[in-house]
């Protein structure tokens, strides 16, 4: 409370690490998944079925159903030189969003599964703020869990081998 009072009074210009940690922790408790328009979620693509892939990963890697939702987002094509985000996890909606670019035979199924698994881990190993106020999105626990994905090395190698292709936007 002391740190918050000092910040609000203008004595401190930066948020104290304890306030940042409290905010991050509180945000993770939010659950707006009931606000989702489930009819708008698109899980069936031309090549991949996200719902089936998500369910298979949930059964294989997690002790209990995570209760997350999944959908495609974005366009099938992108402009050359633009940054690509393969997937996102929106915590308050409990929603995994996978870039529609991945619904393409050029992207192997193990790579698409890896992206889904990675986003699932954002729920299992949430972001936290340390005692210095530094935000950690991919914690040590997250990275350890990520390496348990059976095609982790294959997915990492595929990224390395296809970097030029990914940045050209020629898919």
Task: List where the protein language model places each region.
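Active-site-proximal or metal-binding-adjacent scaffold patches in catalytic folds
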Residues: 1-113, 123-171
């Amino acid at each position: 409370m002391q740190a918050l009072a000092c910040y609000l009074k203008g004595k401190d210009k930066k948020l104290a690490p304890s306030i940042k940690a409290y905010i991050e922790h509180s945000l993770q408790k939010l659950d707006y998944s009931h606000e989702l328009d489930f009819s708008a979620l698109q899980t069936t693509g031309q090549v991949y079925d996200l719902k089936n892939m998500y369910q298979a990963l949930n059964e294989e890697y997690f002790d209990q159903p995570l209760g997350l939702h999944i959908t495609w987002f974005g366009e099938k094509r992108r402009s050359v030189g633009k940054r690509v985000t393969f997937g996102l996890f929106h915590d308050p909606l409990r929603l995994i969003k996978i870039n529609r670019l991945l619904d393409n035979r050029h992207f192997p199924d193990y790579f698409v599964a890896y992206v889904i698994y990675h986003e699932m881990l954002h729920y299992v190993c949430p972001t936290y703020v340390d005692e210095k106020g530094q935000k950690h999105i991919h914690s040590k626990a997250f990275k350890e869990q990520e390496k348990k994905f059976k095609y982790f090395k294959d997915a990492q190698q595929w990224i390395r081998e296809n970097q030029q292709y990914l940045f050209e936007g020629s898919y």
